[in-house]
């Protein structure tokens, strides 16, 4: 069981999250597909039967590449802010970095930046330390 799956009152991590890979989000008139998205279970107690969600997630993670960087930053970030997504991670495999953003009002604020093979505790998952060295492909 993942620490994100732990039910309330259990042990082993923060629990209380649904984390989905490439969920389809219908946010107003916009349809977005982040690389990862997470909802706190108190906001979404059950996963919907529909193949999409109209409920904005609490956290999104975009894996940035040269072909998606502009879309992620210029198009998606303002929509996530408009829809009150609380946290946004931008993972840059080419740079081996993680940028962590928190929404304050309608503005994204950089909370922290990490790189390389660090052990990371990043909002909103500070209870877990992520080993960033496991995120990157081995160099040839």
Residue ranges and their predicted role:
Residues 1-140:
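Gly/Pro/Ser/Thr-rich low-complexity, intrinsically disordered segments predominantly at protein N-termini
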């Amino acid at each position: 069981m993942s620490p994100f799956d732990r039910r309330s009152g259990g042990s082993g991590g923060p629990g209380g999250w649904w984390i989905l890979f490439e969920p389809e989000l219908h946010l107003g008139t916009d349809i977005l597909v982040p690389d990862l998205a997470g909802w706190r279970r108190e906001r979404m107690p059950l996963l919907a039967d529909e193949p999409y969600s109209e409920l904005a997630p609490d956290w999104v993670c975009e894996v940035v590449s040269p072909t998606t960087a502009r879309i992620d930053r210029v198009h998606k970030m303002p929509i996530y802010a408009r829809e009150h997504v609380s946290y946004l991670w931008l993972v840059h495999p080419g740079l081996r970095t993680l940028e962590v953003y928190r929404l304050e009002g309608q503005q994204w604020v950089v909370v922290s930046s990490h790189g390389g093979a660090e052990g990371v505790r990043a909002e909103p998952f500070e209870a877990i330390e992520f080993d960033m060295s496991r995120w990157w492909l081995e160099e040839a």
